[in-house]
């Protein structure tokens, strides 16, 4: 017998809280706890599908809250099971009491993501849409939300589905020619099969591009701002944030700890990390701050290294840069509105590329932002190449198999060789939608969800 599950679907405090119940006992539980405005129980056959009812939730003759409630009949629900939603006041104590009452009536506490997992298992959505739901919940910008919404609408699902249908047609044609070589059937046309495979590859390229774009707007990058004391790190942080977040002072070593804040650049989330100025120091507290600066820099995707234009780069700057493990380095010369000596101009040429910035007159800021946006896009493309992004990983493997199938067909080899690769590609695409994904993969997708979703 299937479980009836329940959870609080809203987070924290607010005007309204939502208790969600799914399963074949949902309606029965509502009948036991809900009383209409006239203090009457509603008979089972009187509950209307998707109608909102006003009343109270009561247990042991005690009113728990004044609520609105709705019963939604399967299969036209989020989980494709009978679903009940109870709209309570948003106080956490009130919501907890009602959830406890629901559990007392036979429901079980839902696991994180279990409602959406039911939607997947019952065929309402596929794995790509489940991932789009979690991206919508966590979206930090309008661009990220819109891209996730396209995913929920089945953008990748349709593309992958179309690709699998085409591969299935190719496999059927191959199987007939392999299994019945002596029968009076039309011989497979290698060139047409190659063209069909190329069409599938083109479709997969689109899926990969869309997924990479979604990742850029979903994950963004971490940017550590590094440099000597008084190079202008905190001023740069405040300028990018457009608020006075970090203390600015002419006294060296003012910033002793790491400060993290987030901004959006054209919808891309950028985590900015202001660090303590790096120099030789005997001060125990300052040395700890400097160690944390290096740690933050080496864990970041990008380091923006600031050099005071009026002082120019020296051997100490070179030593610091050599210690950095960050993949991307952006060298900026701060205070560019002030005069620079001929020697400093000469030393500046030691760097292949640098950006002159001035917080006072705002120069160079757009160039720096543009560079960070560019790096964010490149970084997230690189990240999707590995197993970290399931869709890109599986689609790339499918492309590789299809290219191997093309090679075999172009060489005129037996269809058996190409068939193996096409079958592999078909299975890889099934892993994306969940049709052939392992239980472990499915569980990992839903582990990312919160309670009540």
Regions found by a protein language model. Name each.
Residues 14-16, 50-52, 299-303, 326-329, ...:
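Short glycine-/polar-rich loops that comprise or flank the Walker A/P-loop
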Residues 123, 230, 274:
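Conserved G/P- and acidic residue-centered "switch" motifs that form tight phosphate/ATP-binding loops
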């Amino acid at each position: 017998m299937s479980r009836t599950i329940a959870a609080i679907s809203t987070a924290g405090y607010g005007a309204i809280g939502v208790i969600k119940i799914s399963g074949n006992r949902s309606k029965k539980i509502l009948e036991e706890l809900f009383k209409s405005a006239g203090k009457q129980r509603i008979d089972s056959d009187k509950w209307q599908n998707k109608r909102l009812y006003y009343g109270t939730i009561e247990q042991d003759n005690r009113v728990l809250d004044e609520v609105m409630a709705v019963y939604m009949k399967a299969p036209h629900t989020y989980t494709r099971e009978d679903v009940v939603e109870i709209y309570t006041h948003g106080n956490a104590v009130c919501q907890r009491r009602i959830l406890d009452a629901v559990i007392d009536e036979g429901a079980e506490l839902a696991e994180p993501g279990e409602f959406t997992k039911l939607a997947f298992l019952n065929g309402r959505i596929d794995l790509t849409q489940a991932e789009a739901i979690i991206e919508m919940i966590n979206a930090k910008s309008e661009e990220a939300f819109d891209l996730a919404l396209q995913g929920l609408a089945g953008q990748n699902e349709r593309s992958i589905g179309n690709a699998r249908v085409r591969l299935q047609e190719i496999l059927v044609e191959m199987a007939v020619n392999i299994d019945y070589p002596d029968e009076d059937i039309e011989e497979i046309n290698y060139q047409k099969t190659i063209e069909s495979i190329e069409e599938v590859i083109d479709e997969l390229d689109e899926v990969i591009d869309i997924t990479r774009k979604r990742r850029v707007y979903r994950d963004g990058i971490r940017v550590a701002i590094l440099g000597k004391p008084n190079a202008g790190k905190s001023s740069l942080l405040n300028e990018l944030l457009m608020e006075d977040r970090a203390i600015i002072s002419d006294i060296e070593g003012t910033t002793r700890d790491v400060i993290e804040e987030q901004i959006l650049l054209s919808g891309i989330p950028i985590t900015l990390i202001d660090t303590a100025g790096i120099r030789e120091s005997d001060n125990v507290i300052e040395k700890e701050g400097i160690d944390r600066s290096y740690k933050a820099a080496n864990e970041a995707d990008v380091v923006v290294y600031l050099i005071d234009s009026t002082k120019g780069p020296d051997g100490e700057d070179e030593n610091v840069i050599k210690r950095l493990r960050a993949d991307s380095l952006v060298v900026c010369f701060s205070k560019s509105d002030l005069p620079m000596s001929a020697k400093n101009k000469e030393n500046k040429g030691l760097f292949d590329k640098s950006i002159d910035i001035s917080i006072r007159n705002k120069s160079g800021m757009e160039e720096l932002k543009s560079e960070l946006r560019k790096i964010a896009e490149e970084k997230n493309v690189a990240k999707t190449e590995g197993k970290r992004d399931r869709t890109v990983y599986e689609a790339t493997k499918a492309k590789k198999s299809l290219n191997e199938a093309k090679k075999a067909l172009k060489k005129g080899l037996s269809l058996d060789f190409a068939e193996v690769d096409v079958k592999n590609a078909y299975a890889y695409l099934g892993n994306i939608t969940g049709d052939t994904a392992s239980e472990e993969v499915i569980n990992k997708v839903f582990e990312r969800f919160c309670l009540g979703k």
